[in-house]
Amino acid sequence: YKGTLTVSGKNFEAMKLPFEIEVVNRTLPEPQKWAFHLDLWQNPYAVARYYQVPLWSKEHFDAMRPIMKMLANVGQRAITASIMHKPWAGQTEDHYDSMIFRMKKLDGTWVYDYTVFDKWVEFMMNEVGIKDLISCYTMIPWALSFDYFDQATNRVQFIKAAPGEEAYAEYWGTFLKDFSRHLREKGWFEKTAISMDERPMEAMREAIKVIKAADPEFKITLAGNYHEEIQGDLYYLSIPYGNQFPEEVKAERERKGQISTVYTCCTEAFPNTFTFSEPAEAAWTVLHAVAGGYDGYLRWAVNSWPMDPLRDSRFRTWAAGDTYSIYPGPRSSIRFERLVEGLQDCEKIHILREELAAKGANGKLKKLNAKLSEFTPEGWIKTNKKSPAKMVSEMNALLNEM
């Protein structure tokens, strides 16, 4: 394809720049069919506050639709659902509330209202197109305080209990049994997971006991440090950048159909997607996920906007841009678009690896894997810490060549 780009402006003569583009005769599958498991956590509460619309109203869903569609269009797999009040305390401008109403009746029995949860999940599945996994956070919050409406006192009360305590097991066990029933009635049980993040191993062990006692078929997920003792119980385990699954464990998890990914958060100076990060780091990060043998990538926030996100991307002590990469509007960002570029490259690599292996093109496959190996902590050091922009550009050139 050939064309001309005209550059014009005040006080200078227009310039004509000829250009030529060669389009490779290949197409990618639809994003939801990509092999990469993408998990960027959504915050519906931030959208309601920013647009000043009532929570879960038509106006709220209308405001969320184009934002969430941006995620579906790049292969997002998981729906972020909060099943308790403030699962992460106040680590976002707009705290997450419980999408499930709990009431303790006068006779001591419990009833649950799933109206909001159902609306959110149905919206994300049917209108947005994200439907692989419903991640329900969390049974182990930062503050071990659990809300419910008490009919006897006609007010919201809180139970303070830690994993391993009888009150904790009663509160969660009763709920999970009813939640399992509801999910099965909706046809969502197989897609739903009880999810935790960055919690101590002993607390996780106790929570797992409660989950399995309520329904042994519940899926469980964790974003946190690798613990050999519990990894087998985790359908989906995401570990921090710089950590690796033992090879035999990763192979066994893959055989069982379990998901194993990598995540970055506010901790990693490199690679990341902060406002001040080199934009190519976003692409580098997801290429690293493939290079490291992970199934995908998780990040804890994609639209947890601070007070004035179009003017100031800082939030308290978090690095600027840590809490979002999609802006109100919705507006994309350079770092989000570079992430998309990386995701597309990951799918190209997946396709090429299969094709080259099927053809017995071992030389080309070795060349591709050698270039990809640079996108690991040790591989990057061997390149003398080459700039991410140059590394991603070189990978693009190789993919186009192949």
Residue ranges, per PLM feature:
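Catalytic-core region of carbohydrate-active enzymes that cleave or remodel glycosidic bonds
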Residues: Y236-W318
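Eukaryote-skewed repeat-based solenoidal scaffolds used as protein-protein interaction platforms
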Residues: R184, E202-A223, E228-L237, N243-I259, ...
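Short, hydrophobic/amphipathic alpha-helical patches that form generic packing surfaces
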Residues: M70, K119, F123, A283-G292, ...
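Generic recognition of cysteine residues
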Residues: C136, C265-C266, C346
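Short, glycine- and charge-enriched coil/turn segments that flank and shape catalytic ligand pockets
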Residues: K10-F12, K359-G360
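Aromatic-lined carbohydrate-binding surfaces of glycoside hydrolases
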Residues: K2-G9, M15-A214, A223-Q231, N303-D308, ...
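Catalytic domains of carbohydrate-active enzymes that cleave complex glycans
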Residues: S145-Y148, V156, K160-Y226, Y294, ...
